[in-house]
């Protein structure tokens, strides 16, 4: 009897681990167009809210996760560096210097909530250090 319960428990645990918990966080594909759109929105939001004279660009994506939550929640962990473009200027050709100083590199966790049927993107968390 106990052996059947243990086997059933292990089987359920294995299924949940391999498929993930419904509504739980899962790794996202950085190359997905919706993920890219949310990341661009997150960086634009950061640049709009910061007091930096120059814009920042993502230099490294550390982790991207997504979660179904009345839409899609994207959680980005990224490194951002100061680019060569001042805020308010044309940003199409901004480059990140080859050897940025350590003070110019920040790591951010930015959460974007997407509700495509409402044409809505919203930053719900923005923590940088």
Curated annotation (Swiss-Prot):
**Protein name as it appears in the record:** Cystatin
At what residues does the UniProt record annotate the site feature described as Cleavage? 91-92
* Modifications the protein undergoes after translation, according to the UniProt entry: Proteolytically processed to produce two chains linked by a disulfide bridge.
Q: Which domain of life is it from?
A: Eukaryota
Residues of the signal sequence? Answer: 1-18
Provide the Gene Ontology terms for cellular component: cytoplasm; extracellular space; vesicle
Q: Which InterPro entries match?
A: Cystatin_dom, Cystatin_sf, Prot_inh_cystat_CS
Compartment(s): Secreted
A GO MF term:
cysteine-type endopeptidase inhibitor activity
- What is the documented function of this protein? Cysteine proteinase inhibitor.
Q: Which UniProt keywords apply?
A: Disulfide bond, Protease inhibitor, Secreted, Signal, Thiol protease inhibitor
> Where's the motif Secondary area of contact?
67-71
Q: Where is this site: Reactive site?
A: 23
Which CDD domains does the record match to this protein? CY
**Intrachain disulfide bonds:** 85-94, 108-128
Task: State the family named in the UniProt similarity comment for this chain.
Answer: Belongs to the cystatin family.
Known tissue expression: Detected in ovary but not in all the other examined tissues.
């Amino acid at each position: 009897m106990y052996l059947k319960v243990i086997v059933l428990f292990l089987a359920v645990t294995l299924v949940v681990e391999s498929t993930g918990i419904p509504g739980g966080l899962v790794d996202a594909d950085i190359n997905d167009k919706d993920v890219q759109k949310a990341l661009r929105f997150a960086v634009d939001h950061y640049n709009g809210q910061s007091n930096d004279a120059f814009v920042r660009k993502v230099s490294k994506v550390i982790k991207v996760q997504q979660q179904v939550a009345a839409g899609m929640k994207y959680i980005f962990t990224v490194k951002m560096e100061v680019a060569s473009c001042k805020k308010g200027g044309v940003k199409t050709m901004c480059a990140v210097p080859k050897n940025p100083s350590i003070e110019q590199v920040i790591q951010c966790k930015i959460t974007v909530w997407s509700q495509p049927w409402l044409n809505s993107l919203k930053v719900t968390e923005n923590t940088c250090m």
